[in-house]
Amino acid sequence: MAPSEKDIEEVSVPGVLAPRDDVRVLKTRIAKLLGTSPDTFPGSQPVSFSKKHLQALKEKNYFVCEKSDGIRCLLYMTEHPRYENRPSVYLFDRKMNFYHVEKIFYPVENDKSGKKYHVDTLLDGELVLDIYPGGKKQLRYLVFDCLACDGIVYMSRLLDKRLGIFAKSIQKPLDEYTKTHMRETAIFPFLTSLKKMELGHGILKLFNEVIPRLRHGNDGLIFTCTETPYVSGTDQSLLKWKPKEMNTIDFMLKLEFAQPEEGDIDYSAMPEFQLGVWEGRNMYSFFAFMYVDEKEWEKLKSFNVPLSERIVECYLDDENRWRFLRFRDDKRDANHISTVKSVLQSIEDGVSKEDLLKEMPIIREAYYNRKKPSVTKRKLDETSNDDAPAIKKVAKESEKEI
């Protein structure tokens, strides 16, 4: 059975692409703030869930949330690169495309004047498009992590501390501002809220209550370890679970048309659809062919856009054929060969929904055994959980319409 073909193109990043000189300044600021490379996307990347990760859920504490079908973006609050004392908000994707978002404001906690603004604040989240009965659409930015706030980097802190900082310093002031400035916030290009999370053993609630009520696409679950720091790049403790039929790979598509002995190439005839995997730098290697039937070929041609040398997301059908799902123009490169191997391993060694639910009582018992009072646990609470209560309060508020 094919996954739901919700076109990612339906969700577009709001704002205007920043000029090259501004982007250079923004990249430098972020790199200096985080201690990372200016040309590397600083966001974390999950690994595919396999059977071995069931043990990880038993040994460590995790939060779990639904995996939204949207556009992954980091949100950066700063001062405009060229104008002093002008607050600016930018969204940037994995390609390091920076979009200047206007007509949005994130107030500072306890600022009655409304003149203060956040600088060097970096959030991790995803843009999703909620569709309501009657056709109303609402763009949302769902936050699932906080890398830095007002120049202080929190990547080395634990997840509940990072989320607590977002809840206390950003979400709470925003909610209060919204109540008193309804006219101004009504024109915000998107709503901002904390992504709803459950304890690692709470997936039954996600499957039965949360996911069925979503107004945007979903293609799995994300398990985030609460005991580890935020990692730029691949994070082995950040787990991406998908049903087998939703395990997809992003390839580089290349069309190879038959070369006639005489005359011109017939570009309307069906070509070979070659799928390439990324080997690093600018190197790609052939991986497999993509199966396309006549009906699908006609649909692809009807797009009337170049098809070759584009990133395509593919799934493996019941006959082990790679099939087209959608274009991934939000990505600069196809999946790296290491990621491809990980996804294939996940498909081969996959964990079904039933497998997850079967293990949940054991994972839950292990979690509460770890919660038994100990000196170590109390010290950990004192150093990292001081903002945890704010998470629950704001998470509850974030479920309401802003």
UniProtKB/Swiss-Prot annotation:
GO terms for cellular component: nucleus. Gene3D superfamilies: DNA ligase/mRNA capping enzyme (3.30.470.30), Nucleic acid-binding proteins (2.40.50.140). It catalyses: a 5'-end diphospho-ribonucleoside in mRNA + GTP + H(+) = a 5'-end (5'-triphosphoguanosine)-ribonucleoside in mRNA + diphosphate. It is found in: Nucleus. InterPro entries: mRNA_cap_enzyme_adenylation, mRNA_cap_enzyme_alpha, mRNA_cap_enzyme_C, mRNA_Capping_Enz/RNA_Phosphat, NA-bd_OB-fold. CDD domains: Adenylation_mRNA_capping (cd07895). Heterodimer. The mRNA-capping enzyme is composed of two separate chains alpha and beta, respectively a mRNA guanylyltransferase and an mRNA 5'-triphosphate monophosphatase. Second step of mRNA capping. Transfer of the GMP moiety of GTP to the 5'-end of RNA via an enzyme-GMP covalent reaction intermediate. Belongs to the eukaryotic GTase family. This is mRNA-capping enzyme subunit alpha. The lineage of its organism: Eukaryota, Fungi, Dikarya, Ascomycota, Taphrinomycotina.
